[in-house]
Amino acid sequence: MKKIALLAFAVLVFASMSFAKTITGTVSDAHCGAKHATPSDAAAHCVEHCVSGGSTYVLVSNGKVYQLDSQDKFKGLGGKSVTVKGSVKGDSITVASVAEKTS
């Protein structure tokens, strides 16, 4: 009986890790990271410049920098506040959707 209970608990823990989560933050780049935690025109210009130079988009939320798997979904969103839905594992997000946050 204990083995069944332990197995059921393990299944619940792993299942909860794969559910989609919603995170709001600012799109930055891997080079600058949390330097662009606040949305601005200057941040947008810098992020897009760094990405065009080979850096990748990241999401900064509550001081944490998340790596993003779907880079093409973030084109034109550098330096802007967004809401990302996806699966979070450590500091990486498997992105299901992204939308620019208004106000």
Where on the chain are the PLM-derived regions?
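Mature soluble domains of exported/periplasmic/lumenal proteins and thiol-rich metal-chelating peptides
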Residues: 21-103
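Classic N-terminal secretory signal peptides
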Residues: 2-19
